[in-house]
């Protein structure tokens, strides 16, 4: 019995002497200004002069208009896409046949940007972190990253 009490006491003493501090909740970082600058620099470096900016900070270009009705946030859409960072690192890509999604289940950048396209339309979305994955990393996408998507809206289902 004494041996068990001594072992328990030694165990408690060992862990009570730890010098590690409790982990604080992660701070919220505002990437808005940094992302705005990063997008502008990317557009300039790549000689993209037709990009439009929305009030939220999303930039987009439309290279092919497409025809038909624009989707809404409540639409199901089939989209072929390629997603990459401003350094060119591709993090996701669909087949040319595209992938069907309920637009309401996607990141805010897609919810806002895809409705600019008509079926058959093509273009690019330049999405700041607050409309993408925010301050948390998502697989190969670092926290606070601008993400770029080449978009081909195949259909509105």
Question: Positions of the model-derived regions?
Answer:
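Cross-family detector of peptidyl-prolyl cis-trans isomerase
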Residues: 2-9, 17-157
């Amino acid at each position: 019995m004494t041996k068990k009490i001594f072992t328990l006491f030694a165990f408690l003493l060992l862990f009570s002497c730890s010098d590690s501090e409790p982990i604080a909740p992660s701070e919220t970082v505002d990437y808005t200004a940094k992302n705005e600058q990063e997008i502008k620099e990317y557009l300039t470096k790549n000689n993209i002069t037709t990009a439009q900016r929305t009030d939220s900070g999303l930039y987009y270009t439309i290279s092919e208009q497409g025809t038909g009705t624009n989707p809404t946030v409540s639409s199901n859409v089939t989209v072929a896409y390629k997603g990459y960072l401003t350094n060119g690192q591709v993090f996701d890509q669909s087949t040319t046949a595209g992938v069907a999604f309920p637009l309401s289940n996607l990141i805010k950048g897609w919810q806002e940007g895809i409705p600019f396209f008509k079926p058959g339309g093509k273009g690019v979305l330049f999405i700041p972190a607050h409309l993408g994955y925010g301050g948390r990393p998502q697989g190969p996408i670092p926290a606070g990253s601008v993400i770029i998507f080449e978009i081909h809206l195949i259909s509105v289902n």
